[in-house]
A protein has these predicted regions:
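Bacterial N-terminal signal peptides that target proteins for export
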Residues: 1-11
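Short, low-complexity disordered leader/linker segments with a strong preference
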Residues: 4-6, 22-30
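Bacterial N-terminal signal peptides
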Residues: 10-23
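N-terminal pro-sequences and low-complexity stem/linker regions of secreted or lumenal proteins
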Residues: 26-475
Length: 475
């Protein structure tokens, strides 16, 4: 049953152990130039990627709001009307359009200022649940996402984290490993949408069926000036820099519709030719793929237990645990808590940084405009950068406790942090233009002790779940 309630103002004080919890907020949008973490303080980085939520939709946390987090309780539609955000379940059955076209609809770019006016969310295509209107103007029932609130209140919450791209999951996951969705090195084009695969195949990368295509967008923001291409790209990724430097990595993702396949929209390496390698029985089977891509997302829990965590890990959920509107069963907060608790309760806690983020805004209302919408220019990213806000939590013994970061971040910031941590060169894409999260850390502070995150479902639930993994969205 879908619960519906209009959000009203909330005043709350959180008391922990008899002491008032005070969150510190920091403003500003300049790119940080401070140095990377001291050698050895961070030896492992884990990037947990959830799906399709905006900050206003997912983080109506009264504690964060009271502390100054930039979270709105209402929005403006294309008619100039104020719409109060309405409460809905995390697993509510609707899935707004989140294509590049949907970005343009919600953005309503001003020809005068070159900024999004953020008054077009009502123009996004969506089929709302029966009896509900304006479902794009909604927020998730806080009781269903309390693990996220607990983590964000304890460590660092970034309220100005933006997806780098202006579109859906497949290109977003390319930016999360490469800082680009360009088809080749040096190209000024970007893959801008989820691929059109033949017959609805789950494989949307280099192992997609013949005839599959993905749209390209040019520096003018035009998706029709270039013919669509097969969704298989060739350029450097962060994994190449790691391997060249002798660093280890793994990419954990559930298998797809059939044994041996993967949910391609959500798996960055599948669309990179030199990682996918040879195609065997319609599936990537190259040496890089076989060595580093693990088609079982819960294997990260086992690897932590067995002291086999790699230096850099990406963690992709099943559809049910993804938070993706219309696909999730609401178990996402427990899934994330399981991974965080596994690390926190292990020896890895002492030298690990965990980033929890969401791959795109999901077509859901958010009131903060992107920092720049680059069109008709010679600057990197022109035509497809930047997208809307997505949540981000930074978890580490060296993360600032109870801190709200209002510095501008994007997916390139994650790459840049990893580059600095392991003394890697820059890829020269989104990472080159990004900050490195240095405002979120204090490497001179006494390391924070880990505080276990309460959640409705424990790690055993996910380890023992024998249901076939659900596939990603195909829109």
């Amino acid at each position: 049953m879908i619960r519906l309630r209009v959000l009203t103002s909330v005043i709350v004080v959180l008391v922990m152990g008899g002491a008032l919890l005070s969150l510190n907020s920091c403003g500003g949008s300049s790119v940080s130039t401070r140095v990377p973490p001291p050698l050895g303080k961070i030896q492992h980085v884990v990037v947990i990627v959830q799906e399709n939520r905006s900050v206003d939709n997912l983080f109506q946390d009264p504690v964060l709001i009271k502390a100054g987090a930039d979270i709105a309780q209402s929005g403006t539609n294309s008619k100039g009307n104020t719409i109060q955000l309405q409460q809905m379940d995390l697993a509510a059955a609707f899935d707004p359009d989140h294509s590049h076209t949907a970005f343009n609809s919600m953005c309503q770019l001003s020809s005068t200022t070159g900024q999004c006016q953020m008054n077009g969310a009502d123009l996004i295509k969506v089929t709302c649940p029966a009896g509900i209107t304006n479902c794009v103007f909604s927020y998730v029932d806080p009781s269903e996402v309390q693990p996220y609130f607990t983590i964000a209140e304890t460590y660092t919450f970034a309220d100005h984290m933006f997806q780098t791209n202006q579109g859906p999951s497949m290109p977003a996951h390319q930016f999360l490993i490469s800082g680009t969705s360009a088809p080749s090195t040096g190209s000024d084009l970007f893959a801008s949408e989820n691929p059109d695969t033949m017959g609805g195949s789950p494989d949307a990368g280099c192992d997609a069926p013949a005839g599959s295509t993905v749209k390209l967008i040019d520096p003018t923001g035009n998706e029709s000036s270039n013919a669509p291409i097969f969704p298989c790209f060739e350029h450097q990724t962060l994994t190449d820099l790691l391997e060249a430097n002798g660093n280890t990595w793994r990419y954990y993702t559930p298998s797809g519709y059939a044994t041996g396949t993967a949910p391609a929209l959500w798996i960055g390496p599948e669309a990179i030719q030199h990682i996918c390698g040879t195609i065997t029985n319609g599936v990537c089977a190259g040496p890089d793929w076989n060595a580093h891509v693990v088609l079982n997302q819960t294997q990260i829990l086992t690897d932590i237990t067995n002291n086999q965590l790699q230096e850099v890990s990406w963690v992709i959920p099943t559809g049910l645990a993804s938070d993706h509107p219309g696909s999730t069963d609401g178990s996402g907060p427990s899934w994330v808590a399981s991974v965080v608790n596994a690390i926190g309760n292990s020896s890895y806690w002492a030298n690990t940084a965990i980033f929890v983020t969401w791959d795109d805004w999901g077509g859901l209302y958010d009131h903060v405009p992107p920092p720049q919408v680059l069109v008709n220019c010679a600057q990197w990213g022109c035509g497809y950068v930047y997208g809307f806000r997505v949540p981000l939590i930074v978890i580490s013994p060296y993360a600032k406790a109870g801190y709200i970061s209002s510095v501008q971040h994007d997916f390139g910031s994650i790459l840049k942090f990893i580059e600095g941590t392991f003394s890697l060169p820059s890829l020269g894409y989104a990472d080159a233009a990004a900050d490195n999260f240095s405002d979120c850390f204090d490497f001179n502070q006494s390391p924070l002790p880990f505080q276990p995150v309460p959640a409705a479902l424990k790690a055993e639930y996910f380890l023992n779940d024998k249901r076939p993994p659900t596939a990603p969205d195909t829109d």
